[in-house]
Regions:
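Alpha-helical propensity feature that highlights long, continuous alpha-helices across diverse contexts
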Residues: 1-79
Length: 79
């Protein structure tokens, strides 16, 4: 992932969402052999780069990105 430094809150949320998706993809691929094929088959369609996700799936990652953003702001690590 070669994301440029975010220049706004929205850019930061989007960058965090991309990282969240990458983390989920690595985790889900690692545990896929241990879960039922019905579950992992459903995940496979999301094993793509963040930019290739549907807006609905991107928004699911943004939900978690906003939680990280809120924590960073609460701890005064960002303004």
């Amino acid at each position: 992932m070669n994301t440029p430094m975010p220049s706004s809150t929205d850019d930061l949320i989007e960058a965090l969402a991309e990282i969240e998706h990458e983390q989920w993809r690595h985790w889900s691929q690692a545990v896929a052999p241990k879960v039922g094929t019905g579950i992992s088959d459903g995940w496979r369609k999301s094993w793509v780069n963040y930019a290739e996700l549907t807006e609905e799936l991107k928004e699911a990652d943004r939900v978690w990105a906003r939680k990280v953003f809120a924590l960073l702001r609460e701890r005064r690590l960002i303004e």
